[in-house]
Swiss-Prot record:
Alphabetical list of InterPro entries matching this protein: F-box-like_dom_sf, F-box_AtFBL13-like, F-box_dom, FBD, FBL13/AtMIF1-like, LRR_dom_sf, LRR_FXL15/At3g58940/PEG3-like
Listed name of the protein: Putative F-box/FBD/LRR-repeat protein At4g00315
GO biological process: negative regulation of long-day photoperiodism, flowering; regulation of short-day photoperiodism, flowering
Top-level division of the source organism's lineage: Eukaryota
Length: 441
């Protein structure tokens, strides 16, 4: 008799829960005792994005039977990653049935759907999904139609991810969010024509919000009423022609309508349009800020009275030629800044052009934060061959009086001789405290 036969079923099910679902199912061939143990698994994951036609023929039946035969009192997590339509035998009706079974019979707590289809229309989900009392996490990705009924209530939903889905009408998203009374984390990604013009987020309980928009999605405007928000990330990489000339702040076709966000602590902006005043008006009280502005004009950010008194951490992307202008304005406006990092977003377009005299013309006097508060300075991928970047680095190393650590990374493509020359030049510029640790990589 093998030792596993002496273990209780509860322990064996726990062991199976660490395996991928397809491997857990294979254990049913071991013996009669193992035959149905996998049906007690609290988490089910089906990833069939890469299967042959012959494999796809029995796939729909297998998933249906496994959900019908599921024995656990509740499904903690159900994940479906499927590729169907032109090949295989999975149909939209199958998806509809599986979601219905998970919602009706299994009190699912986390549901994740990623559908890559060849169908003419996105897949419609059952109305019962939008009335599920047990679901806490809902993730919908790709070819899915968010068709929200008039009567909708998700009393337990705390996390919602909507990635590149299609909405049945203009009000679908607003109707959905308005009936999630405890929602805390929301992610909306858009990169297609999805029937959504105005992006309206009115959720009193929301604490984290991530919005990502890229071509060719259309957007008339953003309306936000999120008084409990602590973290905000907005990525808008559409071109101006895709945004209906949103740079015109008086344009009626594109607007921002933000209510106060008194609890906001952290913001992350990746923006490629000029009219960003509305964003900064509501983030002046944050503690952590990350910025990448693909199109920058002085009047778009800096105006009388803009001060970040509580800002302690600043990350700024150096991918654009005018980034140092933005940095100088922020240093002047952030008297209590403690951490500064310059970086480049991975896979981000490089728009840098060397403007050697740009930095020297920006600051009339040393910003207060350099004299009294900045403790950490980090620069990832510093292109020392660009004189503008060398000027910025030398200025900070020369004037940061309270610095505790400075770390600068050069591109790996630089020759050792080139790196050594840059390190020597930067080292000679350093006039910070003797206790400061300076690292070059």
């Amino acid at each position: 008799m093998d030792k596993t036969s002496q273990l209780p079923d509860e322990l064996l099910v726990k062991v199976l829960s660490f395996l991928p679902t397809k491997d857990a199912v294979r254990t049913s061939l071991l013996s009669m005792r193992w035959k149905s143990l996998w049906m007690w698994l609290p988490k089910l994951e089906y990833d069939f994005r890469h299967y042959s036609v012959s494999e796809g023929q029995g796939l729909a039946r297998f998933i249906t039977l496994s959900l019908l035969g599921h024995k656990a009192p509740a499904i903690e997590s159900l994940s479906l990653k499927l590729r169907y339509g032109a090949i295989g035998s999975i149909k939209p009706e199958d998806i509809y049935l599986w979601v219905s079974l998970a919602v009706h019979d299994s009190n699912v707590r986390e549901l994740s759907l990623k559908l890559c289809t060849f169908a003419e229309r996105p897949t419609k989900l059952p109305k019962s999904l939008y009335k599920c009392k047990s679901i806490v996490i809902l993730k919908l990705k790709d070819e899915i139609l968010v068709d929200v009924p008039r009567k909708v209530c998700l009393p337990s939903l705390k996390t919602l991810f909507l990635g590149r889905v299609t909405y049945s009408d203009e009000d679908s998203l607003h109707r959905l969010l308005s009936n999630c009374p405890v929602l805390e984390d929301l992610v909306v990604e858009r990169d297609r024509i999805d029937n959504l013009g105005k992006l309206s987020v009115v959720v009193k309980s929301l604490q984290r919000l991530t919005l990502k928009m890229s071509c060719p999605c259309h957007l008339d405007g953003i309306m936000m009423n999120t008084p409990s928000l602590k973290y905000l990330k907005v990525t808008d990489e559409r071109q101006e022609s895709d945004s209906d000339n949103e740079s015109d702040s008086d344009s009626p076709r594109y607007f921002y309508d933000f209510e106060d966000m008194p609890k906001l602590e952290e913001a992350d902006f990746v923006l490629t349009f000029q009219n960003i005043k509305k964003f900064f008006k509501f983030v002046t009280s944050i503690k952590r800020l990350s910025l990448c502005l693909g199109v920058y004009t002085e009047e778009s950010l800096y105006h009388e009275g803009l001060v970040f008194n509580q800002l302690e951490q600043l990350k700024i992307c150096s991918c654009d030629s005018d980034w140092s202008i933005l940095l100088s304005r922020l240093l002047e406006s952030s008297p209590n800044l403690r951490e500064l990092e310059a970086y480049v977003i991975e896979d981000h377009p490089d728009r840098r052009v060397d403007l050697p005299n740009q930095w020297g013309n920006q600051l009339n006097c040393v910003p207060k934060c350099l004299l009294s508060s900045l403790e950490t300075f980090k620069w990832s991928e510093m292109y020392g061959l660009l004189q503008n970047q060398m000027d910025v680095a030398k200025y900070i190393l020369r004037n940061a009086r309270c610095l505790k650590s400075a770390t600068i990374f050069f591109p790996t493509t630089y020759a050792k001789e080139t790196r050594d020359e840059m390190i020597e030049e930067l080292s000679l510029s350093f006039q910070g405290p003797e206790t400061c640790q300076v690292f070059f990589h």
